[in-house]
């Protein structure tokens, strides 16, 4: 069922004030029910991503891909790449030392700037799933993330 509502234009500001007041204590923070929590300072690796991604044959028919949280992951500037802008499909790629990566589709230059640091690192918590790329490389597909800190070095 669908319906519509209209209000006189002169009442618009009053409605906005009313809604703002009514929902001022409402927490809009996303909440995820995850299957596993990894320590972003030590648990991330191609092997860990592969172990979960390679179980893809059991997902489906009521069994969803496991949703994984990564806590306290540091992104250094040299790890972060943004590509696909010219094709209209901006994608962030965070390369790990072992060749695997964390990937976020539907990104932007603004998001890249938020996560990039030339003089230190940005710390995030993220949620997502493990997959393999088209080339068979294990990767972590970021569903959502939050920036929890940053460290800039000044000399």
Predicted feature locations:
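Acidic, two-metal ion nucleic-acid-processing modules in DNA metabolism proteins
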Residues: 1-155
